[in-house]
Amino acid sequence: MINLYYHGGSENHGCEAIVRSTSKLLSTKLFLWSTAPNTDCTYGLDNVVSIQEDGSVPLAGLKLLTFKMHHKLTGSDIFYTKFSHRNFFSAVQCGDIYLSIGGDNYCYAGKDILGHYNQIIHEKGGKTVFWGCSFEPSEMDAATAKDIARYNLITARESISYETLKAVNPNTILVADPAFVLDTVELPLPEGWKDGNTIGINASPLIMQCAKDGGVAYEAYRHLIKHILDTTDAAVALIPHVVIENNDDRIPLRNLYEEFVPSGRVLLIEDHNCCELKGYISRCRMFIGARTHATIAAYSTCVPTLVLGYSVKSKGIARDIFGTEEHYVLPVQELRDKNELADDFDWLLANEESIRSHLKCVMPEYIQRAYTAAEAVSRLK
């Protein structure tokens, strides 16, 4: 049996895309352990996988006292993880396969908890896979290396992470993010969409947080839209890809929409599932995006794309596709001037046809990398 774990819910449509694509790649019944199963059902994942809740249950009484003693003696919180997520761990079966599907969860706080999951699953006889992942090289300390070495298989979605992970765990292969095989659903286009001449834009609160000056990042988006309206006859479609409370793309996008809607050329796409969002992105002339899986939707459908990136995954994916990240990724941490995003858009516009031709040439073979990950999982059974 194959299980997917460490899934935070489908209001992050990148997470939803990973689940749908993984199901397509593995072509077998999957069990999804989710911390927000209600959101998964909202977007129809219950029609794709069997959803189980992996909620955190508070410790109390004797269990809480035992945890405190264990923590004092060992300095580890693994006891807390094991018992607060006992619904998941009680279901772990010897010989079953468990895919950690967060992708870049090791790049954020809480990687010790990921290590706890990995260790406990192995103690119960399960096999673990670090699936479609990215990893910041600077995050590889001794404790993390010990954890990473424990995985039975690692499928790295870009070469920067691959080199880092391969040095620690020889069971590491280079693949493409599973979402490159995501199905596309084309809904009717909204009024005002210019067929073949609509520029897609995705912005996120996370980008504003990662920028040295969040105000400059927002101003860069404002200036970009104004620049497109002033220098082209294209329409602009604002497309959200994450709608989680306190991290909702619709907040900055709605603010931008309200400012520029009087132009008659700016549209705001509402929330949809990831396949439907890919349908809109695939029909854009070009795409400028902050969310990784929004940009993957563009790359995979050969839409010339500029990424406003903040991590290794953006750089690594662009480097693997184009041979360089220069001009294709604007690191948000380095953003100093509101004109930079518009300047990079101008480069994209000037090279639009050559970029599209390159994507059409390389994408079929690149997408096949995702299937090598599925083949590697089948060999674990």
Question: Can you describe what each PLM-predicted range is?
Answer:
Residues 1-381:
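Active-site anion-handling motifs in enzyme catalytic cores
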